């Protein structure tokens, strides 16, 4: 029995992430990555959060883009982000988990070692995810229990997609 306004089985969530929406989610990560790179190549401003980790204007800008666009695609699924207000995850069965700029310290060093991360979590397990590397336009994502990598073209579409062979966990 559900105690929240919506309840989805893992099957229904996976069905929500159809091919077209995967492409749109990759495009969202690409748009956020472009904004990160724009700031990377201009002026970076930094603040220190309560947990003593840095947050930049690129973190905030990418966060706004990703959260806004995911809410348009999936208004019924909450979005939780590292850069948003803290939310009690125990109350959330299914949610989007976003790290708009993973590797802020590396971003500040301007070494190119940072990513945009988007994951869908259900029952405390990731069931879909995207890792996008803006510096070289490489994306890694999961779909139908398989992992893929590809190059994101300037218009946000995928090319050179290949399956990544992974070992099964014991």
Where are these regions (language model features)?
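Short glycine-aspartate micro-motif
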Residues: 95-97, 117, 129
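Conserved structural elements of the adenylate-forming
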Residues: 111-115
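Acidic beta-strand-loop-alpha-helix segment within the catalytic core
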Residues: 119-170
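N-terminal subdomain of lithium-sensitive/metallo-dependent phosphomonoesterases centered on the IMPase/IPPase/PAP
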Residues: 11-101
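Glycine-rich, Arg-bearing micro-motifs that act as flexible, cationic patches
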Residues: 108
């Amino acid at each position: 029995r559900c105690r929240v306004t919506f309840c989805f089985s893992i099957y229904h969530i996976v069905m929500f992430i159809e091919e077209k929406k995967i492409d749109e989610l990759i495009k969202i990560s690409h748009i956020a990555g472009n904004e990160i790179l724009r700031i990377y190549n201009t002026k970076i401003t930094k603040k220190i959060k309560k947990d003593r980790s840095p947050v930049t204007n690129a973190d905030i800008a990418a966060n706004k883009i990703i959260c806004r666009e995911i809410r348009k695609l999936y208004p019924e699924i909450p979005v939780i982000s590292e850069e948003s207000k803290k939310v009690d995850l125990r109350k959330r069965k299914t949610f989007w988990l976003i790290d708009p700029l993973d590797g802020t310290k590396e971003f500040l060093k301007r070494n190119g070692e940072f990513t945009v991360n988007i994951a869908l979590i259900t029952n405390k397990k990731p069931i879909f995810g995207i890792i996008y590397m803006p510096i070289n336009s490489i994306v890694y994502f999961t779909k139908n229990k398989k992992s893929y990598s590809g190059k994101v073209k300037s218009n946000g579409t995928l090319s050179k997609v290949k399956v990544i062979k992974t070992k099964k966990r014991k």
